[in-house]
Amino acid sequence: MWRFCFFLSLLFFDVSAVKSAESIFLPSQIGVEDSRVFESLSLSPVCSAADPNLNYKPVIGILTHPGEGRWDARLHSLKNYAYATNISYIAASYVKLAETGGARVIPLIYNEPEEILFQKLELVNGVIFTGGWAKTGLYYDVVEKIFNKVMEKNDAGEHFPVYAMCLGFEILSMIISQNRDILERFNSVNYASSLQFFKNVNIEATVFQRFPPELLKKLSADCLVMQNHYFGISPDNFQGNPYLSSFFNIVTTSADKDSKTFVSTIRSKRYPVTAFQWHPEKNAFEWGSSEIPHSEDAIQVTQHAANYLVSEARKSMNRPSSEKVLSNLIYNYKPTYSGYKGSGDDEVYIFT
């Protein structure tokens, strides 16, 4: 008897499975009425035409920084060494950030002859000023010259974005404020923080515009961004400087380890210029510090920041010859793995 019952249960299972399988149809197996449902879902997609107002092969120029990327107790001797040897570098995480958004990179070697440097600037659709320590000397002067040239391009009608991070934020603040002493000391080295959106801020046209609402909430409640700087600007001092307050809107602030508030994200009111005191590139691409956030939410912050950078660069109509671009791309250089040495960056491009 039990065998008979077992047989019936198997038979019932097989019939149910067959019916279930038969309920799954390919488009060619359904009737005319049902086929209309599939037609409404566009099973025969039409590829959209390219937008003539967008550049689908954007190139980002990244300015090199003096030195080899090492960051330790010998900082002052490293500064002297860097300037004496003419060595410069780019942390590979900045390159990967641009590539994540769909762009290629051309290194802008800061101590090359100015004529060559500005020839390369004509090959790119946007510029990144990276983190580092060089706030004086040739490096500062080169950042200022490039920034002024970029502003001329924008004033002439060319959309040319700037992305400035950490040191880049600080130097732009010094340049625009016309005050090299504008920076203040903060206890904000090597730690993760939240971002607090500034009062009455409108995030439209900012890096945060396309962030999902849930991620925007988490930015203010969780430690999703990496801070690594000794200097910054308080909101009061920022707003108290007429040049800064007329050029930039404060988008976010953050607090250091002593709960002192500093400006952490700014966006130009008129130009495609965004500056971060924090490091959007580190979450996904740097592993040397245990403080760097690597959660899925933190990685999304990096991805959205990269997408924004490149979406701005796509608006640039600068389209130089392919041959000139290819011969200057960073693919012509080899990165050096330096993470095992305890460097501040896992991977760097070194230029000698």
Curated annotation (Swiss-Prot):
GO annotations of cellular component type: extracellular region; plant-type vacuole
Among Gene3D superfamilies, the record links this protein to: 3.40.50.880
UniProt KW Signal keyword: yes
Give the transmembrane ranges.
none
Q: Where is it localised? A: Vacuole; Secreted, Extracellular space; Secreted, Cell wall
Secretion signal, residue range per the UniProt entry:
1-19
Q: Where is the Gamma-glutamyl hydrolase domain?
A: 49-352
Q: Where is the active site?
A: 166 (nucleophile), 279
* Reaction equation(s) it catalyzes: (6S)-5,6,7,8-tetrahydrofolyl-(gamma-L-Glu)(n) + (n-1) H2O = (6S)-5,6,7,8-tetrahydrofolate + (n-1) L-glutamate
Key word Hydrolase present: yes
So what EC number does this one have? 3.4.19.9
- Describe the function of this protein: Cleaves the polyglutamate sidechains of folate polyglutamates in the vacuole. Is important for polyglutamyl tail length determination before vacuolar exit. Plays a role on folate stability and intracellular folate content.
What family does the Swiss-Prot or TrEMBL record give for this protein? Answer: Belongs to the peptidase C26 family.
Which protein, by its recorded name, is this?
A: Probable gamma-glutamyl hydrolase 3
**Gene that encodes it:** GGH3
